[in-house]
Amino acid sequence: MYVYKRDGRKEPVQFDKITARISRLCYGLDPKHIDAVKVTQRIISGVYEGVTTIELDNLAAETCAYMTTVHPDYATLAARIAISNLHKQTTKQFSKVVEDLYRYVNAATGKPAPMISDDVYNIVMENKDKLNSAIVYDRDFQYSYFGFKTLERSYLLRINGQVAERPQHLIMRVALGIHGRDIEAALETYNLMSLKYFTHASPTLFNAGTPKPQMSSCFLVAMKEDSIEGIYDTLKECALISKTAGGIGLHIHNIRSTGSYIAGTNGTSNGLIPMIRVFNNTARYVDQGGNKRPGAFALYLEPWHADIFDFIDIRKNHGKEEIRARDLFPALWIPDLFMKRVEENGTWTLFSPTSAPGLSDCYGDEFEALYTRYEKEGRGKTIKAQKLWYSILEAQTETGTPFVVYKDACNRKSNQKNLGVIKSSNLCCEIVEYSAPDETAVCNLASVALPAFIETSEDGKTSTYNFKKLHEIAKVVTRNLNRVIDRNYYPVEEARKSNMRHRPIALGVQGLADTFMLLRLPFDSEEARLLNIQIFETIYHASMEASCELAQKDGPYETFQGSPASQGILQFDMWDQKPYGMWDWDTLRKDIMKHGVRNSLTMAPMPTASTSQILGYNECFEPVTSNMYSRRVLSGEFQVVNPYLLRDLVDLGIWDEGMKQYLITQNGSIQGLPNVPQELKDLYKTVWEISQKTIINMAADRSVYIDQSHSLNLFLRAPTMGKLTSMHFYGWKKGLKTGMYYLRTQAASAAIQFTIDQKIADQATENVADISNLKRPSYMPSSASYAASDFVPAAVTANATIPSLDSSSEASREASPAPTGSHSLTKGMAELNVQESKVEVPEVPAPTKNEEKAAPIVDDEETEFDIYNSKVIACAIDNPEACEMCSG
């Protein structure tokens, strides 16, 4: 059997030669479990006559990827083979690659089609020796196989369909695209990104250094006006933004409802849905950067709009096709008044914005006064508030949407409140910025890789978290994002105007779950909750400090005066809480009041779906969804096991084919294994096995340091109206801005697992674990304070205990989510004297025949116990086991 070499030569397939090549790439891997000969045997079985060496390397990489379930080091080996293959096919010198991309001529048209901007090309040519020598190609081998395949599929630039860039080339291109002629800053960014301390968001990786460097991820668009001209001008703006890889949040509160009078034609309006379908088709047609990602729009609507029932159902799988728009994402911009009416089982009135103008232009007490005035004047149609609430929950259970964002919390706790009323969030519910017909809000994103700051002692017995290093890196990311604002290509002038005036940025995180697992902290432990607080306090302080330093050099952003920050009010002040106290907030506050900040907003932890795949971590701040899952690439589907769990099971001596099949049957859960120590069961709980109350508590803890919001998904294995209501009201009373991004659920029934041998799977419970082999470093919590000596930490000291996971402030029990007084994070449940009778919510009345949109029929007993029960909503009862939230 013959193989064709890269130079066209033909030679016999040699077993020993393949084995030697694989062995050379096994450095640093576990020799007990990585067998180069076994890999070669599997490769040979798939070889065919006339295979090329490139195809042979691809086959070898895929073979190792399939063996990842044997040991996680096989994933590393797969990546090394794939990257070694890429290195053989691509030019090494960065400057030569840039030149090839710059001088690219389109084969179909014969015309020049440069993929690198003139500016970046000239910078590279002028500094090519310095840049070429700065690149460390060995860092390419630190990517996982699936991380590399993600880069290869969508991020690395191609010439005539062939990948031309290496991962290190991409990172240097991004660094130069951001910093231009500031070579030292570019090299700092290159080194930190290539060492995987942080990554910029996908649009920045796609477009930095290209002729049209649109590096922003998020755009918040305002409907220009309720007219044909206004609607179609807005549609064009959305198309231009989507064309350049931007995700869109669009508020449509001001569009008249179905049946409203149209003065210009003396007719009546068709309402929101036909217009929404036009936007739906635009999202389908205009993808993000040539099939890299589909176009994506989220539409925001307040629940008083008369078309609200049709709006929340647009993604449902059944119903009339002409009232569906399944490529858009509905989102609710909910005022506190609606939540109060649901809680009280009160009425709710629906209006057309033409008959009740101004409701979207105010919030808080002003909104309530205007809304109740319109109600008294009889301008709308009144329904039971819980009827609409039920329809919202029904849609969420079926489709995962609509998203829930709280209007009053977003406006009340924003540093942009001096600009006007904020009317929407973005596609992923983490960006909260002011937008107007002449200003499209923009945000540039980057995420810090949290596991990169774990340090293990020389003897391997203890591990610590380096907050000082995290602080330094977060400041670098802040400076980078601020630079992106100036170097960015803006698809529409409204976006340029807004971004230059207010200069918001968004720092996020990825790998929080990985950090907890590496430090051996269960996600729902008190230690993990404290670390969560410390991490976000550190990043917020770093971002504000860096922004203040930039303001001292370049001046504050244009609209700084009049903002809360200009008065010394920071995000935790708006929550009426004091910071944990690791950092010197008093000095920073004084500096901000004196010099200003360069950026109006700095924090917004976002979903990191693609970039966390690249770096090999779990998404953003979420727990793991499963300890075993499938990963699809072009060549097929691969089973992937949580690498931390897999190493532990291998060391315990109980990982085998039976254990693998057991995990598949249990959807990645190890909770039913009698031979696994309890500490591992606690450590490797999936999100389905963690109380959602814990998730919401941790979200509220970090929100004190998040001046925008964050993309908070909620997870319910089997959602019911009671559980959903309980979660929504708990999050609202905690003061969250984003109550829910997606609702994630599990299928009601599992597919038949034809490939599983149940007898083999059952043997997994019989293996005897050798706990003596499980030696891992223990976490040493940080007691360091980086505050000035005269700064007294508010709230808690480094050695203080933090609240139990069931604790909450008395303010969070009230009907209004606004905090009523300063309170310490150490206040526990025992200190509270909460009366169950504070909140009484009557049961949902049975739907009557003449109601326009009857609720689905449910069992009476389930309705009485499950829906809007006062105990479920208040969550303040003596017997936690009787509460849906407390019992998990």
UniProtKB/Swiss-Prot annotation:
PANTHER family: RIBONUCLEOSIDE-DIPHOSPHATE REDUCTASE LARGE CHAIN, RIBONUCLEOSIDE-DIPHOSPHATE REDUCTASE LARGE SUBUNIT. Two distinct regulatory sites have been defined: the specificity site, which controls substrate specificity, and the activity site which regulates overall catalytic activity. A substrate-binding catalytic site, located on R1, is formed only in the presence of the second subunit R2. Signal peptide: none annotated. Keywords: Allosteric enzyme, ATP-binding, Cytoplasm, Deoxyribonucleotide synthesis, Disulfide bond, Isopeptide bond, Nucleotide-binding, Oxidoreductase, Phosphoprotein, Ubl conjugation. Its main location: cytoplasm. Residues 804-825, 839-861 are annotated as: Disordered. Optimum temperature is 30 degrees Celsius. Its EC number is 1.17.4.1. This is Ribonucleoside-diphosphate reductase large chain 1. Residues 1-92 form the ATP-cone domain. The modification Phosphoserine is found at residues 227, 816, 837, 887. Disulfide bonds join 218-443. It comes from Saccharomyces cerevisiae (strain ATCC 204508 / S288c). GO terms for cellular component: cytoplasm; nucleus; ribonucleoside-diphosphate reductase complex. ATP binds at residues 5-6, 11-17, 53, 57. The record marks 741-742 as: Important for electron transfer. There is a cross-link at residues 387, 853 (Glycyl lysine isopeptide (Lys-Gly) (interchain with G-Cter in ubiquitin)). Transmembrane segments: none annotated. It comes from the Eukaryota. The record marks 218, 443 as: Important for hydrogen atom transfer.
